[in-house]
């Protein structure tokens, strides 16, 4: 008796803005089947599609040689979509890998490419050590790298696009003994592969099962390795049914293509909030343990230690960092606010020490924050970043506003912040951007403008707090730069401290910056900023998972039941997920009301609930040594930051 394995795949074609479904074109399809006998190189069989009559199936894929596998294909129309179901049946035990390609009508050189959360345009902002056109113009990758298991190709000249998305029950994965070359899986996986190829100058969608990565596999930051092809056992008499979906549409530009595709993917996967027993109040109570146990109070700068911390002991380190990973001042404000609201004298006392020591010892001669100090080595960063400085001011404004609303004032802090904002005005370039890095004498170290939106936030906050229109005008100039160089070009890059690649935080920061400006604007100006926020938000959303990747038994994240929907990929170069969200959920709820778009608020709820899953408390420490220490680097795919790999955290924890 045949066993139909529940790994379903079909192809569906739909047109955006056009009536009726597209016709499946067999002449545009290519396929191959690779079979491997253990201990021997795999043999690849090119396949030819033959039309059938008087059969349940419409087509059969055939090889020139006799092979121990039958491959049938059925085409059906559902609503405005065309579905193609491929069924493989083994005549004897085989280890197989199936691949199909569909040619578009697009010249490869005219196209931009999109694999959500991993590949944007041609990834040319990344170096050749990461996946990009620098290495090849054809790439296929395993599906769990992607926030949606989809590949999209956008023809800029024809203003058309085509996507392929996997439709399957992603319920399992299997371990392999190695990560490159031909690998036989230890069990059954749900993971296939997807990507794009240049077929004689024509762009083609490529996809298959089980997973494959070519021409290289990406194993850790800036480290490419030889390609990998996985082979899964299909026993004699067993069948496997596979399903993909092809979607076609039109878009004025790459941004419209991405926004249409995100909406299509959202409607396809329909992610639901993740059910946990953790209320917001309980979550905050658990997280407050970090504020107590991580406090370091015997240094010139007091701080909560969360940078470069080991997950197996969570011992405090010597690193005090104002923004970026450390967020010392924002942690202090969160502890301060929570302490007042919950009558926690211990939290208030520690937070006050952080603010007091930074006020006295935390500034450079020119008035910048000492943004990174390592007390173990004595190292102090002398090259400043607009991001860390901005995030420090952002935190202090939250503190000052809270204090003012509760009848307390801090004129010394106000003077410090005002001085920093005045120096910001000197740093700003004529076109509105801010340099990414600079020295205390304002000499420029890195002129890249990708981090500019991080400065918009404190400038708007400074305008609201001090009623100083100079700061608002400066913030508006940043928006002019963002619109011209990032948002209009759909090119969100280098928001981090050193990498230049496309990353989630660049679009998230751009959306937050224009959101802040919309809140302090009226009329046409407000409408304009709101539109920019929406555009940037779609790109930020594209990084967040709409589906749950499978894990193999023994991989900790899978064993504790992690659902990846709602978590965000980090960047083109760093293929892990994290909890970076900050105000983005509030922005999505705001946009939902502004545009009567329920998807935004619904997904904000998915994000908010999903972020609670790895809350570490006694009996549910999730691989972390201490209660309340929530990890950042969560390795969900076949990539690692140098240790552990899929299903685990990096051995270091960033709070």
PLM feature segments, named:
Residues 2-10:
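Sec-dependent signal peptide recognition
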Residues 24-26, 40, 56-65, 70-236:
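Beta-strand/loop-rich accessory regions of lumenal/periplasmic or secreted enzymes
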Residues 30, 37-40, 46, 51-53, ...:
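Low-complexity, Ser/Thr/Pro/Gly-enriched N-terminal "stalk/linker" regions
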Residues 273-280, 338-352, 399-418, 460-476, ...:
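Structural helix-adjacent loops and short alpha-helical linkers that scaffold large soluble proteins
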Residues 287-320, 360-381, 424-444, 483-501, ...:
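Glycine- and aromatic-rich loop/turn segments at beta-sheet edges
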Residues 321-339, 374-421, 448-459, 501-518, ...:
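Aromatic-rich carbohydrate-recognition surfaces in CAZymes
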Residues 376-380, 398-469, 477, 484, ...:
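Active-site lining segments of carbohydrate-active enzymes
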Residues 653-655:
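Conserved small/polar residues in nucleotide/adenosyl-binding loops
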């Amino acid at each position: 008796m045949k066993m139909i394995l529940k790994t379903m795949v079909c192809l569906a074609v739909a047109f955006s803005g056009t009536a009726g479904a597209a016709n499946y074109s067999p002449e545009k399809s290519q396929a191959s089947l690779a079979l491997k006998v253990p201990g021997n190189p795999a043999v690849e069989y090119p396949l030819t599609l033959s039309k059938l009559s008087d059969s349940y199936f419409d087509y059969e894929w055939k090889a020139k040689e006799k092979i121990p596998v039958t491959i049938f294909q059925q085409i059906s129309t559902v609503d405005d979509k065309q579905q193609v179901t491929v069924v493989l049946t083994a005549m004897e035990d085989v280890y197989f890998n199936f691949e199909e390609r569909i040619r578009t009508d697009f010249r490869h050189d005219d196209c931009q490419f999109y694999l959500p959360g991993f590949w944007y345009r041609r990834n040319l902002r990344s170096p050749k050590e990461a996946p990009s056109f620098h290495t090849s113009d054809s790439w296929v990758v395993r599906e769990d790298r992607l926030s949606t298991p989809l590949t999209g190709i956008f023809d800029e000249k024809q203003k058309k696009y085509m996507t392929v998305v996997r439709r399957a029950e992603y319920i399992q994965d299997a371990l392999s003994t190695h990560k490159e070359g031909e690998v036989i899986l230890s069990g059954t996986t749900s993971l296939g592969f997807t990507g794009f190829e240049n077929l004689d100058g024509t762009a083609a969608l490529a996809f298959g099962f089980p997973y494959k990565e070519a021409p290289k596999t990406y194993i850790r930051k800036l480290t490419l390795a030889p390609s990998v092809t996985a082979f899964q056992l299909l026993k004699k008499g067993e069948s496997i049914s596979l399903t993909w979906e092809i979607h076609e549409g039109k878009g004025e530009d790459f941004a419209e293509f991405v926004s249409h595709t995100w909406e299509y993917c959202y409607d396809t996967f329909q992610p639901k909030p993740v059910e946990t027993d953790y209320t917001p109040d309980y979550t905050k109570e658990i997280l407050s343990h970090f504020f107590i146990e991580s406090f370091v109070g015997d240094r010139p700068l007091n701080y909560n230690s969360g940078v470069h911390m080991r997950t197996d002991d969570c011992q405090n380190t010597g690193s005090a960092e104002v923004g970026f990973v450390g967020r010392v001042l924002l942690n202090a404000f969160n502890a301060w606010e929570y302490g007042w609201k919950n009558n926690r004298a211990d939290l208030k006392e520690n937070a006050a020490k952080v603010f007091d020591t930074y006020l006295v010892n935390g500034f450079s001669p020119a008035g910048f924050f000492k943004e990174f100090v390592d007390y173990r080595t004595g190292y102090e960063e002398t090259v400043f970043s607009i991001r860390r400085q901005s995030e420090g001011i952002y935190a202090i404004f939250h503190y000052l506003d809270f204090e003012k609303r509760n009848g307390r004032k801090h004129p010394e802090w106000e003077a410090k912040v005002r001085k920093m904002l005045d120096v910001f005005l000197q740093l700003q370039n004529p076109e509105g951007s801010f340099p990414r890095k600079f020295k205390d004498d304002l000499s420029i170290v890195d002129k890249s403008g990708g981090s500019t939106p991080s400065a918009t936030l404190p400038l708007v906050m400074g305008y609201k707090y001090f009623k100083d229109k100079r700061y608002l005008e400066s913030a508006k100039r940043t928006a002019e730069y963002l619109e011209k160089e990032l948002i209009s070009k759909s090119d969100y890059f280098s928001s981090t401290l050193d990498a230049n690649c496309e990353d989630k935080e660049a679009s998230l920061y751009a959306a937050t910056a224009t959101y802040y400006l919309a809140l302090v604007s009226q009329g046409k100006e407000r409408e304009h900023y709101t539109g920019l926020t929406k555009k940037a938000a779609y790109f930020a959303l594209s990084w967040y998972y709409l589906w749950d990747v499978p894990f193999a038994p023994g991989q900790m994240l899978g064993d504790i039941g992690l659902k990846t929907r709602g978590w965000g990929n980090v960047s083109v170069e760093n293929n892990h997920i994290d909890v970076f969200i900050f105000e983005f959920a509030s922005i999505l709820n705001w946009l939902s009301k502004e545009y009567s778009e329920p998807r935004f608020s619904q997904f904000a709820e998915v994000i908010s609930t999903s972020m609670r899953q790895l809350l570490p408390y006694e009996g549910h420490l999730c691989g972390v040594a201490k209660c309340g220490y929530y990890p950042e680097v969560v390795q969900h795919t076949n990539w690692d930051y140098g240790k552990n790999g899929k299903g685990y955290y990096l051995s270091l924890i960033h709070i």
